[in-house]
Amino acid sequence: MSGGGEQLDILSVGILVKERWKVLRKIGGGGFGEIYDALDMLTRENVALKVESAQQPKQVLKMEVAVLKKLQGKDHVCRFIGCGRNDRFNYVVMQLQGRNLADLRRSQSRGTFTISTTLRLGRQILESIESIHSVGFLHRDIKPSNFAMGRFPSTCRKCYMLDFGLARQFTNSCGDVRPPRAVAGFRGTVRYASINAHRNREMGRHDDLWSLFYMLVEFVVGQLPWRKIKDKEQVGSIKERYDHRLMLKHLPPEFSIFLDHISSLDYFTKPDYQLLTSVFDNSIKTFGVIESDPFDWEKTGNDGSLTTTTTSTTPQLHTRLTPAAIGIANATPIPGDLLRENTDEVFPDEQLSDGENGIPVGVSPDKLPGSLGHPRPQEKDVWEEMDANKNKIKLGICKAATEEENSHGQANGLLNAPSLGSPIRVRSEITQPDRDIPLVRKLRSIHSFELEKRLTLEPKPDTDKFLETCLEKMQKDTSAGKESILPALLHKPCVPAVSRTDHIWHYDEEYLPDASKPASANTPEQADGGGSNGFIAVNLSSCKQEIDSKEWVIVDKEQDLQDFRTNEAVGHKTTGSPSDEEPEVLQVLEASPQDEKLQLGPWAENDHLKKETSGVVLALSAEGPPTAASEQYTDRLELQPGAASQFIAATPTSLMEAQAEGPLTAITIPRPSVASTQSTSGSFHCGQQPEKKDLQPMEPTVELYSPRENFSGLVVTEGEPPSGGSRTDLGLQIDHIGHDMLPNIRESNKSQDLGPKELPDHNRLVVREFENLPGETEEKSILLESDNEDEKLSRGQHCIEISSLPGDLVIVEKDHSATTEPLDVTKTQTFSVVPNQDKNNEIMKLLTVGTSEISSRDIDPHVEGQIGQVAEMQKNKISKDDDIMSEDLPGHQGDLSTFLHQEGKREKITPRNGELFHCVSENEHGAPTRKDMVRSSFVTRHSRIPVLAQEIDSTLESSSPVSAKEKLLQKKAYQPDLVKLLVEKRQFKSFLGDLSSASDKLLEEKLATVPAPFCEEEVLTPFSRLTVDSHLSRSAEDSFLSPIISQSRKSKIPRPVSWVNTDQVNSSTSSQFFPRPPPGKPPTRPGVEARLRRYKVLGSSNSDSDLFSRLAQILQNGSQKPRSTTQCKSPGSPHNPKTPPKSPVVPRRSPSASPRSSSLPRTSSSSPSRAGRPHHDQRSSSPHLGRSKSPPSHSGSSSSRRSCQQEHCKPSKNGLKGSGSLHHHSASTKTPQGKSKPASKLSR
């Protein structure tokens, strides 16, 4: 039938077949043949004429005729009218039906059916399946497009089974089940095929029931986890790994019986149809469904007549290019191998013959099932009326064909169009939005309504459509229940999938960032929730309304979304999964790092969702308990390789590494994948705007980013400041992190503009990740955090804290991390964005703006000074960025050194840092809880924290033992200390002020010290972080900054030399990184200090016990101890051959950095390759620089350690440059660790 039919119509309008059926129009066509609307000249009724070419290799109509004849007299089966053949074609004539279920579902505003409609349709479909099984045949292609509603008032509420072309007889002449074949070719439609079909096993009766189950889920959710995946093998793999019980949450509870039963069946076992029918009956009773209730597509017109609403003119059967769009039985086209069916098994007497045309002898037309006899022509074709009304009614979604997995080429004919022979009455004024009726129907039954509501709120297990449907439902709920979400959603909440995001959904192409559908959110369908693809609003949690707006990550800005989409296009498919497009709303869940990890998938999904929607609600469970959403996301991760890659490793370490390798790639240097980074940041970007609301949700995001995405997210965050107030905050953070580094970050941020806004809290997470990761991670963390700060700018909390001190620390740690690990180097590459000085300068300007905004709250002058310094550092960093581009890993190391160097410069620019500190302190006051939470997340991931060699060793030790449990414990410990952290933040604020007055060198040292330890310390406590910062600053400056120091020394950009005690610098830095209460609230220094202490504990301890003990110490000691810890901890990263923290920043600048002395701090962090290349090498050589797996040491006197670290850093710098750098790194690890941690904290 595909022979001549594909190019030229087999029949033309006006042709008379067998001198009885006059062709009126073509209503469908596909691989199997064509379907025509014909007029029966004998009965004067419209019929469906299905034709296949006689030259077609696989003859399908023989089986169709055989089965159709066997089924005559059964309910839900079209009336057979006639058949025949000639030299040109074979044909079958049957009763013409109305719209198919696939088209009807897509016509709904949400792309879903209510429970009421789903249950009644499901029961009818089950009856039709039982009917075909009763005659010894399997349908083998059960799907929505193969079921259609009747055309006339008497039949419009009856569902008819269509398309028996793939049927197979499973019984022999004796009625016994035929033995199964060892290998049977795949038959059916990929989306709805059973696992047996994918395994090429002989299909049995239970396989038709599995397809029914998938249909029911799609009816309720709007999509399946593998909806957009066309590859048969991939879909089969997903189905095998997917926990189908996750789908039950969308169905009535009774369907657990349905699933259990079909799961227990095999080829030979006869299904208990009575049991399955009782499931539908009981559910109908439970939800108060009334059989006479109108279906979702039916509405009551003004005249009281029942009208069916249709939104598309697509053929009745869309699957496999099904031409039976108007309910033409067996009208489904068969694509590809579907034609390879054993039609030769048709009984010999089932041949097509003209003699069989006509009504069977002895059977009056009136007695035929569904036959109304001659009066039928007088009956109104309800579907034609619907079509007429359709012309005057614009439906929100009409994406009929795209949804069918096999409908690559939809039937060209419009089966939905009114038949030429049937009367058409236009009653557009009568039709009402079909959305109203479902609502009324819901209100009729409390149970039904509640179920619908629950289904709406709950997240989809794995599918794009699942997610979309849930998202859409959530959108409604969100608009009603979440004002905070609505602003950013704009109408569509995006959810990082349970993925994200339930990774299974990731497999869905819809979940994939959908490079093919980057503008899906803009499409009318997506705007509607996507008739076929987009049900953007999805709340994984069944109690979405219970979630605070804080728990939602929202993207308010179209610009951000556009940027995100742009970024998605690049990294969309790299990190995203097919489910990226699927918008899903994740609620912030108080969950363990594992939960957050689970949410990585959701973020991937979020990327897609964000692409789809300008406004996305990203609610991830940062620290909340794991929920079904997170579980779903986990499933998605498992099912979605793409999603997994996007999220990288579920574990913090793998995540960080993956991000470093791929998404991390920033703009200028050969970074892993800018696209992936951008996509990640893009998703975060959506989350970032809601940052104010969602600090915790951001944590999971950070985890997602931690390997590489975190970096990209961080980079994006820094880039964010240019794009808005949030970005300004980011800029402030970045300024403090390292002016040189900041420009690079800004560049990357610009490229990843969207990510930051989505990453308000995620930035913080990234910061922690950054700590865990080598320098780049740190930088990314900083960026993310700063992005979060952006949102907090309005809050007046987070931004300043990170920008002033954390920035420098971040830079140092980044270099440190880069030295430690190659992956981290890729992360560091994100900082490499610096090469674009202009962009960096712009970023600095933005940062300046943000800083001024934040500092206006605290210390505007300092911020301004810092901004200026940042600009200088940007220049330096640009040159270093070039170096980094030349060397990814070495570049990252160089970035660390550069970062440290930049930190030194920043210290010179203490006034600016002071401003940043001021801003940070305010930010700390503004959102200490979120920041703390984010840090706690990082604590769990501290293993990824880039640390000096020693620090890495200790970090690895503590990290591996701490792992999820320790991280969770740390998180728990951290949360109780939020108040303390807040107090610490206040203390840090004052400390930041001290930093501003302190010499640049001290600041630089502090920053250098902070980087490695900062991640873990940051995770632990703000206070410990501060302590670690001072220690780390010294050690990190010594090791990390040693090259950076030389660079910073070389950097020609003059920087104000304001000396600040290392303790002060560290504590201020820490305070910057600590979450602050919302703007207007007094800063809480103690809380920050407590957090820093935690971080310090993480950084300094080699084991979990050490971490905990240190954490306790930090909590006890207060902000002073964190400061000292920072000094001690600051690992002497090879990049910090710089003089002790007190030494001027310039000395820190290494000769290699001299060309970029002004922007060296940035350069060292972002692009060590050029000026910080020696640093980069050092990083490579020194594991702690690359990454500190174990928390950097938090112990040690801050000043002494700093000095030691600096000294150590100098040798380390040389060592890093040389082969001995690794040794130096390890040697300096102890001292630098503390410093590195503070840097991490600061970066946060």
Swiss-Prot record:
| Catalytic activity from the UniProt record | L-seryl-[protein] + ATP = O-phospho-L-seryl-[protein] + ADP + H(+); L-threonyl-[protein] + ATP = O-phospho-L-threonyl-[protein] + ADP + H(+)
Q: Which InterPro entries match?
A: CK1_Ser-Thr_kinase, Kinase-like_dom_sf, Prot_kinase_dom, Protein_kinase_ATP_BS, TTBK2_STKc
Outcome of substituting residue 842 to G: Found in a patient with SCA11; uncertain significance
Active-site positions, per UniProt? 141 (proton acceptor)
Enzyme Commission number(s) from the entry: 2.7.11.1
Q: Which residues are listed for ATP binding in this entry? A: 27-35, 50
Query: Which SMART domains does UniProt cross-reference here?
Result: S_TKc
Q: What is the effect of changing residue 50 to E/A?
A: Leads to inactivation/destabilization of the protein
The residue ranges flagged as biased composition, category Low complexity, are 1145-1171, 1188-1203
Q: Which GO terms describe its biological process?
A: cerebellar granular layer development; cerebellar granule cell precursor tangential migration; cerebellum development; cilium assembly; embryonic brain development; embryonic digit morphogenesis; forebrain development; microtubule cytoskeleton organization
Q: Which Pfam families match?
A: Pkinase
Region named Disordered: 674-694, 1052-1088, 1116-1244
Q: Name one GO molecular function term.
A: protein serine/threonine kinase activity
- The molecule here is called Tau-tubulin kinase 2
Species the sequence originates in: Homo sapiens
